Amino acid sequence: MGQKINPLGFRLGTTQSHHSLWFTQPKNYSEGLQEDQKIRDFIKNYVQKNLKISSGVEGIARIEIHKRIDLIQVIIYMGFPKLLIENRPGGIEKLQMNLQKEFNCVNRKLNITITRIAKPYGSPNILAEFIAGQLKNRVSFRKAMKKAIELTEQADTKGIQVQISGRIDGKEIARVEWIREGRVPLQTIRAKIDYCSYTVRTIYGVLGIKIWIFLDGE
C-alpha cells in the first residue's frame, strides 16, 4: 500500500524551507519548539479576536520565527495586512507588547514585521480559511470548492486539489469529497507544491479541509 507523506516535509531542502530558524542544545530543543508553537497560536488568536472580518479570512499564510541570543524576529506573511495595520492604529506595537508580556522576554528583544503576499489566494492557508468561512455559513461544499478554485486561477497557479472530509452538508455518514483542477504532481520532489490541512467546526461536527497547490517548477 502507498504511504501518504506530508508534501512540505517531503520537499524540505529542495523547494521548501523551514519556518523556524534557530539553534539550541539538544536538551532545550523541545522547549524552543513549544515556544514557537505558542507564539504562532498567540498571534493567530490575537488576529482572530481583534479583527472582525466579514469574509472570515484572517489572511495569515505563514509565520516565520528567527531566533538569536538576544532577539526573536517574527515575520508574519499576510495576504491582507491592511486589516491589521489600517483598522487598528498601533496594532503591531500592541501585538508586540502583548506577546513580550505573555512570554516574559526579559533578556531578549522581540521584533514583529508584517510582509504582504502578492497573490493571497495562491496560499493554501488563506484558501482553507475562505472555504471554512463558506462552510460555516452553510454554503454548499461544491460551491465553496469551485469558488476557491476560481480564486486560485487569479493567482496564476498551475494546479490545485481540494479535499473535504467529515459529515459534509450534515449527512449522517462521513465521507470524503475532492476536486482537482490542472496538474498536482505529488511524487515529483522538484515540483513546488504548497499544502495545508485545516480543521473547521460546523454545527454538524468537525470537517477536515486539505489543499494542495502546484505553484511552479519541475
Curated annotation (Swiss-Prot):
Any one of the GO CC terms:
chloroplast
Family matches, as CDD domains: KH-II_30S_S3
Q: Where does the record place it?
A: Plastid, Chloroplast
Q: Name one GO biological process term.
A: translation
Main location class:
plastid
Provide this UniProt record's keywords sorted from A to Z: Chloroplast, Plastid, Ribonucleoprotein, Ribosomal protein, RNA-binding, rRNA-binding
**Which InterPro entries does the entry mention?**
KH_dom-like_a/b, KH_dom_type_2, KH_sf_prok-type, Ribosomal_S3_C_sf, Ribosomal_uS3_bac-typ, Ribosomal_uS3_C, Ribosomal_uS3_CS
Gene3D superfamilies hit by this protein: 3.30.300.20, Ribosomal protein S3, C-terminal domain
Give the transmembrane ranges.
none
Q: Name one GO molecular function term.
A: structural constituent of ribosome
Q: Which domain of life is it from?
A: Eukaryota
The family database entries (SUPFAM superfamilies) matched by this protein are listed as: Prokaryotic type KH domain (KH-domain type II), Ribosomal protein S3 C-terminal domain
Task: Provide the family line.
Answer: Belongs to the universal ribosomal protein uS3 family.
Subunit structure of this chain's protein: Part of the 30S ribosomal subunit.
Name of this chain's protein: Small ribosomal subunit protein uS3c
Which taxonomic lineage is given here? Eukaryota, Viridiplantae, Streptophyta, Embryophyta, Tracheophyta
